[in-house]
């Protein structure tokens, strides 16, 4: 075993070779030294365990191939582009909404230049970074003003911290939601320093329940969109319009966490109906919060629209600065919102809406091409079929609704396991992410952004 240890080169010897000098030129001295030390440590452990040299130390060329490979991997960004074939268009784990071309160009432009982020070009003095988008949102929603933060949970936190600290917030028991990552509405309220007052029951809440709970310490009445679940059967709830009327009568503000935040009626495209921001504003809700990267189809942001005097108080709260968005997000959001000024072109310009409205005929064509490519690459190892599928919007939007789709399914036919194929899919330069269902891999075309790129990726199999 001692002889094996002696065969290992020193770090200095590796660095002084021509290959070592090339590595230093490409990756830098510090990174190369660290990788060499790591490799040698692992080699010593391997020798102790197996009483032989690892393969990559069998000759110098293989050693340098291994070092180069590790250094390349270290330099790669770990957030990788993937092919979404899960059938969930707004997949939280895969980054939710794809940015439009307009949003990408706007973001790239502000990355490369100094911009008028907080500067009024007409007046020649400082302005507020939310101003551009606030004007646009008012035009689109009918609200008086708007406030932008980094996500919808932050929007809810800011509203609670600004108006309800040390006070009571009345909410229906059926709306005490938990979203992904065990993040709960009651927890946000606790962080904001307000007191939760639950009214009604899980399945039935009436207007009188809110009325009876109002006290002099009530900050506001709150509605929360139950985006990731539905209560069915013997149910009753109070609409925002009814609640707003009660709020005006009792001089208590009403706020709504709308969650997904649609700016258009999706039913016009044959999709499930979702409440729009405009509807809530028109119903008299004082503040409406929603996400920028769900049904809106843009960047991750929390958007609050509503009455000007309340928005001004949100903007003045110290927490707003901690939650504000940078120039890239604001540019991407503005560009996304401007697409809504021409709604007739939305299905062409907005990737989320394009994916959700793709005709089945096109999905079938894409499925046939995908099936042919898989069959040519997998050499009859699996049973590959085209089947009808049921896709979903995702990110908590209409959780019980499904959208007709088409999928390529892969089932075992030989001794090659699906788990092995799934692992191979994930090792590709742009990994393929499908779903396992009924003993098959389902590759759902509804959520796929680029068929040509996928087919090229499959050539690596």
Swiss-Prot record:
* UniProt keyword terms in alphabetical order: Cytoplasm, Protein biosynthesis, Pyridoxal phosphate, Selenium, Transferase
- Give the GO cellular component terms, alphabetically: cytoplasm
Pathway listed for it is: Aminoacyl-tRNA biosynthesis; selenocysteinyl-tRNA(Sec) biosynthesis; selenocysteinyl-tRNA(Sec) from L-seryl-tRNA(Sec) (bacterial route): step 1/1
List the InterPro entries.
PyrdxlP-dep_Trfase, PyrdxlP-dep_Trfase_major, SelA-like, SelA_trans, SelA_trans_N_dom
Q: What enzyme category does the UniProt record give?
A: transferase
Obligatory cofactor(s):
pyridoxal 5'-phosphate
Q: Which residue positions does N6-(pyridoxal phosphate)lysine occur at?
A: 294
Answer whether the UniProt record assigns the keyword rRNA-binding to this protein: no
The UniProt entry, under Pfam families, shows: Se-cys_synth_N, SelA
Q: Which domain of life is it from?
A: Bacteria
Q: Which reaction does it catalyse?
A: L-seryl-tRNA(Sec) + selenophosphate + H(+) = L-selenocysteinyl-tRNA(Sec) + phosphate
- State the Gene Ontology terms under molecular function: L-seryl-tRNA(Sec) selenium transferase activity
Biological process terms from the Gene Ontology for this record are:
conversion of seryl-tRNAsec to selenocys-tRNAsec; selenocysteine incorporation
* Cellular localisation: Cytoplasm
- PANTHER family, per database record: L-SERYL-TRNA(SEC) SELENIUM TRANSFERASE
The family note in this entry says: Belongs to the SelA family.
Known function: Converts seryl-tRNA(Sec) to selenocysteinyl-tRNA(Sec) required for selenoprotein biosynthesis.
Protein's name according to its UniProt entry: L-seryl-tRNA(Sec) selenium transferase
Q: Species name for this entry?
A: Haemophilus influenzae (strain 86-028NP)
The upper taxonomy is:
Bacteria, Pseudomonadati, Pseudomonadota, Gammaproteobacteria, Pasteurellales
Report which gene this protein is encoded by. selA
